[in-house]
Structures are given as structure tokens and as C-alpha cells.
């Protein structure tokens, strides 16, 4: 079987121990670094003469790094790859150099759904936080809007629909299967106006909510952002949170974007600062997908 000469993980990539051991089946030499490189020079030093490279979401391999490492044949992203534009690898330049780049998708979504249910139920019932209304309410009958009906957005929508919520969605394209299941498509402005709770489930670097959209959302509403980064203008978010009855939820601070100092001290901002998708099961699935990508590339090189 074709093998790489040398495979380097330039930073922690969240592989489970058995997956780390399996890397030796695919490369004659394997080197795994346990910390995040400080800069491009350190990344280049770590890669050296490796022909296969793994990285997570905490570093970037750009044109300058690729130019300095001519032996690279494969770059494996052990993190979500949504699009070339949002990737932390210069995929277009890598392609010019004949380097194969593969990422993974859909490995941490179940944890995100559980996070959403936990926080939403806590708010509706007053479990561990101030109650949204004057008395406990169920998810049943709650008007929910999902902005971005990809894999995680659809899973959140399905879970809330199962609990009895009235679910509407906005997406770049209509989703017939969602509408067949009873979910309603609405233009973004109507969804924001009509929904009591809104979830932004967008790809990285996709910003849909600005000042006009937050004005349409209005007071007395709840916003969850389950995206990796902000799906909104952060300054507009802060102004919206000055209105009565508003609440904002995110699992990590990065999901709030560039907010002012003291933002997370607000009573109506709820952030666990722990990535909800990084669970034991997610790391197993991540590892399986990373190894499958390596096998795919080696098969192409035979």
C-alpha cells in the first residue's frame, strides 16, 4: 500500500488514541505536536520535509507556508471545511501546487442540539437562570425561527419540532423535505419579526444580521448563535441587547464576535465558553473522518 514518507500534525488535532496509532499505517514517520505553533515560521519548521500535514482550526496554512514546504502532497483539516473562502488553508494555492486538501463536516452536531435544548429549557422554566416569562412555559407552541437549514440547523429544527415548537426557517434555498415535515419557509425579515426564539446556524464568515435585521427582531426575543463565528454585526447585537426582554446565547465567546469589554457580564448574555460540539462521541467521529480522508488520498496516489 502507498504510504506517505512523513506525516506531521502541526498542533493538537483531537484524534482519539487509537486513531493516532493508526496513522503509522499510512506514513513511514509520524510526528504529532502537542501545542499550537506561534507563527508561520514555526509552522514551516514543524512541517519540514513532510509530505502530509494535519491541522485543526487553531492555525492557518497560507500561501507563504505552502511555498516554503515544497514536499507537501496532502493537507488534512481536522476541523470543519465549509468552503474554500472560509477555510484556514489556502486551498486555491494548494491546488495550483498539486496539493490535495480535505476537511471534514458534521461530526459535532448532536452535542450542539443538546446544548440548545439544555439552555432553552433552562430559560423557559427558570432552571439556573431568570425565567423568560412570569411563569414556566413549554417548548410546545413556541414560535422558533432557524436561520440556515444545513445539517445542524435541520437537527435543531427537528428536535424542537418534536417537542411541539412551531418551526419556520430561512435558507438560501427552499428545503422541500423540511416543508413536508411541517416547517414553514419565511423571508428573513418575516422570520425575525414572527419568531420568539431565533437560531443562527450559518457557515463560518457568513454575516446575515445587521442593524436593520435586529430592528426587525425587536424586544422580548431570544437569539441563539450555534455557528463557529458570529452570524451578525456584533455592534448591532449589543445595541439589540439593550432592549428589554432580550437574551443571547452562544457556547463559545468566539461566537459573539468582536464585542465590547464587559459584554459577557451582561445578565441577558449566556455563554458557557465551552464548545458544545466537542464531545467524546464527536472526537470518535472526527477521528474516523480524518482517517478516511487519508485513505482516500493514498488511494488516489497509487
Put a short name on every predicted segment.
Residues 1-50, 164, 168:
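N-terminal glycine-/charge-rich "phosphate-binding" loop or analogous flexible N-terminal tail
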Residues 2, 18-22, 95, 100-112, ...:
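C-terminal helix-to-coil terminal segments
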Residues 4, 72, 140-143, 220:
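Phosphate-coordination loops involved in phosphoryl transfer and adenosine-cofactor binding
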Residues 50-131:
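Phosphate/diphosphate ligand-binding glycine-rich loop within oxidoreductases
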Residues 126-156:
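Glycine-rich NAD(P)-binding loop of Rossmann-like domains
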Residues 162-179:
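NAD(P)-binding Rossmann-fold cofactor-contacting core
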Amino acid at each position: 500500500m502507498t504510504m506517505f514518507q512523513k506525516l506531521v500534525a502541526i498542533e493538537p488535532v483531537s484524534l482519539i488514541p487509537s486513531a493516532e496509532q493508526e496513522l503509522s499505517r499510512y506514513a513511514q514517520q509520524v510526528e504529532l505536536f502537542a501545542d499550537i505553533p506561534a507563527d508561520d515560521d514555526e509552522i514551516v519548521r514543524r512541517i519540514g520535509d513532510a509530505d502530509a500535514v494535519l491541522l485543526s482550526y487553531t492555525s492557518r496554512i497560507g500561501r507563504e507556508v505552502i511555498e516554503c514546504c515544497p514536499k507537501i502532497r496532502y493537507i488534512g483539516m481536522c476541523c470543519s471545511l465549509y468552503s474554500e473562502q472560509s477555510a484556514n488553508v489556502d486551498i486555491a494555492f494548494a491546488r495550483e501546487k498539486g496539493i490535495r486538501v480535505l476537511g471534514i463536516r458534521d461530526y459535532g452536531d448532536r452535542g450542539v442540539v443538546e446544548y440548545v435544548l439544555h439552555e432553552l429549557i433552562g430559560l423557559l422554566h427558570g432552571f439556573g437562570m431568570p425565567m423568560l416569562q412570569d411563569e414556566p412555559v413549554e417548548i410546545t407552541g413556541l414560535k422558533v425561527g432557524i436561520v440556515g437549514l444545513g445539517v445542524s440547523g435541520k437537527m435543531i429544527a427537528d428536535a424542537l419540532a418534536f417537542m411541539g415548537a412551531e418551526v419556520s426557517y430561512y435558507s438560501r434555498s427552499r428545503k422541500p423535505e423540511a416543508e413536508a415535515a411541517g416547517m414553514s419557509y419565511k423571508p428573513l425579515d418575516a422570520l425575525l419579526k414572527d419568531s420568539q426564539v431565533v437560531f443562527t446556524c450559518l457557515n463560518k464568515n457568513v454575516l446575515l444580521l445587521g442593524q436593520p435585521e435586529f430592528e426587525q427582531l425587536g424586544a422580548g426575543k431570544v437569539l441563539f448563535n450555534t455557528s463557529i463565528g458570529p452570524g451578525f454585526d456584533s455592534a448591532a447585537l449589543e445595541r439589540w441587547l439593550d432592549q428589554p426582554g432580550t437574551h443571547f446565547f452562544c457556547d463559545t465567546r468566539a461566537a459573539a464576535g468582536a464585542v465590547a469589554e464587559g459584554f459577557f457580564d451582561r445578565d441577558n448574555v449566556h455563554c458557557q465558553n465551552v464548545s458544545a460540539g466537542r464531545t467524546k462521541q464527536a472526537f470518535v467521529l472526527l477521528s474516523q473522518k480524518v482517517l478516511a480522508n487519508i485513505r482516500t488520498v493514498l488511494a488516489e496516489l497509487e
